[in-house]
Amino acid sequence: MSKMTPQEMAAKIGSGLLSFPVTPFKADYSFDETTYRSNMDWLCGYDVAGLFAAGGTGEFFSLTAAEVPEVVKVAVDETKGRVPVLAGTGYGTAIAREIAMSAEKAGADGLLLLPPYLMHAEQEGLAAHVEAVCKSVKIGVIVYNRDNAILQPDTLARLCERCPNLVGYKDGIGDIELMTRVYTKMGDRLTYIGGLPTAETFALPYLDMGVTTYSSAVFNFVPEFATNFYAAVRKRDHATIHAGLKDFILPLIAIRNRKKGYAVSIIKAGMKVIGRDSGPVRLPLTDLTEAEMAELTALVKALPVAASAQQAAE
């Protein structure tokens, strides 16, 4: 069980960069615990405020309900309290509660509540869903506002009154007006996380709206670049930010946008580039082609900080 209160967890993750480690798989697509332990230990050596086990980049959608707590338990064991470990949960309410409780038992410090599977629901239904998950555990919960689970400010305010352990709001929409209304309504009651794909692109404007942190997928394979970029965002160092976007982030996005599902696939490909091969993505996702791998390799190796990541893997 976590030793952190929901409020302590929220304060910690709001103080620095966050990331979602990939879930390594073997050739037969089974969980590769050895590689996962190695990756988690390595990532903990960098300045990161929280790691999300079995999150979106960790292919939560392809894990079974039994695999999620298994992955979380390994993450908690390997990080050894160096950083908070948060777990993904989602799907329908019954399954989300089941995964939430098993993740709490496995030692997770908090939860990221992903949108329910496929269905669109009214605000009252979404609110009841979030409340049911929050009340099934004692650890802190972060709601992920995106796709078919968009909570409006008034709904969020009511949930915060009913659920003291609802401590975070992750935005995956990019609706500036909605984000402004949420922050204006809730203020410092919540910790706000930027959660758009390749969040570095939106980090600076979001900082001015009270979003002090974001989840960096590229932290998985270029952690030094990711932490340097985050530091530049906090300092509002426009020159460094724009150089990072131009030289790395935007070219990476160009490769990612070629095929559906590449938001996850390209991160696992990046792990392979630096010598930390974490196996294939699970179906229905597909891996990068050889030509795309060559492009990504050239892009990563052009980074001055890429050499240190590769040396650490050797």
UniProtKB/Swiss-Prot annotation:
<dbReference type="Pfam" id="PF00701">
    <property type="entry name" value="DHDPS"/>
</dbReference>
<dbReference type="GO" id="GO:0042838">
    <property type="term" value="P:D-glucarate catabolic process"/>
</dbReference>
<dbReference type="InterPro" id="IPR013785">
    <property type="entry name" value="Aldolase_TIM"/>
</dbReference>
<keyword id="KW-0456">Lyase</keyword>
<dbReference type="GO" id="GO:0008840">
    <property type="term" value="F:4-hydroxy-tetrahydrodipicolinate synthase activity"/>
</dbReference>
<comment type="pathway">
    <text>Carbohydrate acid metabolism; D-glucarate degradation; 2,5-dioxopentanoate from D-glucarate: step 2/2.</text>
</comment>
<comment type="similarity">
    <text>Belongs to the DapA family.</text>
</comment>
<dbReference type="InterPro" id="IPR002220">
    <property type="entry name" value="DapA-like"/>
</dbReference>
<protein>
    <recommendedName>
        <fullName>Probable 5-dehydro-4-deoxyglucarate dehydratase</fullName>
        <ecNumber>4.2.1.41</ecNumber>
    </recommendedName>
</protein>
<dbReference type="InterPro" id="IPR017655">
    <property type="entry name" value="Dehydro-deoxyglucarate_dehyd"/>
</dbReference>
<dbReference type="GO" id="GO:0047448">
    <property type="term" value="F:5-dehydro-4-deoxyglucarate dehydratase activity"/>
</dbReference>
